[in-house]
């Protein structure tokens, strides 16, 4: 009997992306997998259809839109009470956590598992992630310090090649297997014992920064976050953020503030936190206004094109 690898995906009306996720999964590993859909209240019927189509898919409704990290935590916590689809045991100590808009590259999961055997202190391993246009997304980064992270957050949208953003995103480094500060939570191979040791994802983060926070806490507990570019996936990430960019931007800034404020606590640092909060609020206002202007221009061009 072969051990089964659990794959946890959080769904919220994922649309056609889920089919690509599941169809490509068979190419990613020769090992049997069981997909656990932590559903945060989908209304498009896609997760239910996937359960009917794929015998190795199970639907685990969370009861509400709990956010990414909370849904993952609850699902991983249930693994001890479940087994594979035919009663097989789980792969010892490993679980895949991924967004449902990931499309798996051939052999990508096997490459992550192979790397795990080379890094006995790896708490999380992440693949090379490509955007839909084929470019490499900077998914393996340094831990954001107050200066580096703050300057990236404030200046990045308006000056993408500023030195703080460039250092933080590590875009000038050639892809190589190495420990990094943190890995994108859109696709991770996670050591369950390490994940449990640090308490899983911090559930204060509804979305964004929960992966940065996890990488930080894993590192402080003596675990490594390892980038494995021999494993490749494609991430169709615009499907969720495109629905309501203003609210997603606000959520990102809230999570950024939580992360940095946690690491700069104390009454004597209150002015620093006030400055950070104000800077993030200003950034949010400017970016939302810019987004609305672009949207109005696009609509105007469409109207003009009809005449």
From Swiss-Prot:
It comes from the Bacteria. Disruption phenotype: Cells lacking this gene lead to irreversible loss of viability. One of its GO terms (molecular function) is hexosyltransferase activity. Its EC number is 2.4.1.289. It is an enzyme of class 2 (transferase). Keywords: Glycosyltransferase, Transferase. It catalyses: N-acetyl-alpha-D-glucosaminyl-1-diphospho-trans,octa-cis-decaprenol + dTDP-beta-L-rhamnose = alpha-L-rhamnosyl-(1->3)-N-acetyl-alpha-D-glucosaminyl-diphospho-trans,octa-cis-decaprenol + dTDP + H(+). Optimum pH is 8.6. Its cofactor is Mn(2+); Mg(2+). GO terms for biological process: polysaccharide biosynthetic process. CDD domains: GT_2_like_c (cd04186). PANTHER family: RHAMNOSYLTRANSFERASE WBBL. Belongs to the glycosyltransferase 2 family. Involved in the biosynthesis of the mycolylarabinogalactan-peptidoglycan (mAGP) complex, an essential component of the mycobacterial cell wall. Catalyzes the transfer of the rhamnosyl moiety from dTDP-rhamnosyl (dTDP-Rha) onto the decaprenyl-pyrophosphoryl-GlcNAc (C50-PP-GlcNAc), yielding rhamnosyl-decaprenyl-pyrophosphoryl-GlcNAc (Rha-C50-PP-GlcNAc). This is N-acetylglucosaminyl-diphospho-decaprenol L-rhamnosyltransferase. It comes from Mycobacterium tuberculosis (strain ATCC 25618 / H37Rv). The lineage of its organism: Bacteria, Bacillati, Actinomycetota, Actinomycetes, Mycobacteriales.
């Amino acid at each position: 009997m072969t051990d089964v690898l659990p794959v946890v995906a959080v769904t919220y009306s994922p649309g056609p992306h889920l089919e690509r996720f599941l169809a490509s999964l068979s190419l990613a590993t020769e090992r049997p997998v069981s997909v656990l859909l932590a559903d945060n209240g989908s209304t498009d019927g896609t997760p239910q259809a996937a359960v009917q189509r794929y015998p190795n898919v199970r639907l685990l409704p969370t009861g509400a839109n709990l956010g990414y990290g909370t849904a993952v935590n609850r699902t991983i916590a249930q693994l001890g009470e479940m087994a594979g689809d035919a009663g097989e045991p789980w792969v010892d100590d490993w679980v895949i956590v991924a967004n449902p808009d990931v499309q798996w590259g051939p052999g990508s999961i096997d490459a992550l598992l192979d790397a795990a055997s080379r890094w006995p202190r790896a708490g999380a391993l992440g693949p090379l992630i490509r955007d839909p246009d084929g470019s490499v997304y900077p998914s393996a980064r340094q831990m954001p310090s107050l200066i580096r992270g703050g300057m990236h957050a404030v200046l990045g949208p308006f000056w993408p090649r500023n030195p703080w953003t460039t250092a933080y995103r590590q875009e000038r480094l050639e892809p190589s297997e190495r420990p990094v500060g943190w890995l994108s939570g859109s696709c991770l191979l996670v050591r369950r014992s390490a994940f449990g040791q640090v308490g899983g994802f911090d559930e204060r983060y509804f979305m964004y920064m929960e992966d940065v926070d996890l990488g930080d806490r894993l590192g402080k507990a003596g675990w490594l976050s390892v980038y494995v570019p021999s494993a490749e996936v494609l991430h169709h990430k615009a499907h969720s953020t495109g629905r309501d960019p203003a609210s997603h931007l606000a959520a990102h800034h809230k999570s950024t503030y939580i992360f940095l404020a946690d690491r700069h606590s104390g009454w004597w640092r209150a002015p620093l936190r006030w400055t950070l909060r104000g800077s993030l609020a200003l950034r949010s206002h400017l970016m939302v206004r810019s987004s609305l202007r672009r949207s109005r221009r696009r609509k105007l061009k469409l109207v003009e094109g009809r005449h």
